[in-house]
Amino acid sequence: RQRTRPFDFQRKIHNMSHPDIPGFIERIRAVTEEYDAIFTVAEVGGDDAEAEMKAFTQGDNRLNSAYGFNFLYADRLTPSLVCAALAEWPDEEGLGWPSWAFENHDAPRAVSRWCAPKDRDLFARMKMLLLASLRGNIILYQGEELGLTQVDIPFEQLQDPEAIANWPQTLGRDG
């Protein structure tokens, strides 16, 4: 993935992969335990995302779930991609619980990335069935359930501050 946003150039020494994060997560969990029906989830990226997702979710005193970027920036949906992602989360007691996302505000819509235009309607349905069949929770990006494709929005219509500041290098969050 091409580095174009200011975030991509930051040294993330205090907000990613920091040794104090698991302890901080335990403090968050302690607060959430005071309320009913709370679900906590982490978005985890970086060089050691798999280990960190497990560390952030293992046991009963950390987050309920985590998701990474296995699918978000993949150019193609392949059986090996799905198998590799599932292999990271074997069904083992105390290991943690995954969540899965194929799309979000920082990645192009999966239907546009993974499928030719002529097959998008059927592919969007298949993609939702696949997402629902993965062991874990589903995280849907607004419009994903409808099979929405990535939209090019003219600069004049942009609302997203990051897209405006980095035009035309970055994908806007408006579409």
Q: Positions of the model-derived regions?
A:
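Active-site and adjacent substrate-binding regions of carbohydrate-active enzymes
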Residues: 1-175
